[in-house]
Amino acid sequence: MILNDTAIKLWVQRGGVSPFNPELVNPASIDLRLGDEFINLDNGRQYKRQEITLRPGCAILATTLEYIKIPPFLCGVVYLKSSLARQGLDHALAGWVDPGFSGTLTLEFHAHCPVTLQAGQPVIQLVLQQMIAEPELDYSKTGRYHGQTGPTMAR
């Protein structure tokens, strides 16, 4: 079952996302914004800036501004904002958020056209889903990226 705006706001009140802007809540998702840290996947260089322009063929890791906490009874799926897809940006199919995850999300972007991104702009939508039952071991006990902040290379 996908959470609606009312349930998302309740999740937020229980510490689900920080910082929180109520304008980012949609009927069945919450927008998450771009942070200011990036890793160029071509050369491994790390950047901290308010704006980044991706050239065609460029691939980067980025991070969300928001730190999220997914309780063991929820999971999430991340989708690129369609306005960015229409500009030629792809988000790699690594958009699953396990129950029990806490941290900023690492985003894998690939540009097909020149695209300029601003820190603080909404870039993805997080859709939260209710689990039938809690897992035996949630991500807080098993995950390699639990508690991450900033873009994180593969471990």
What are these regions (language model features)?
Residues M1-R155:
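DUTPase catalytic domain/fold
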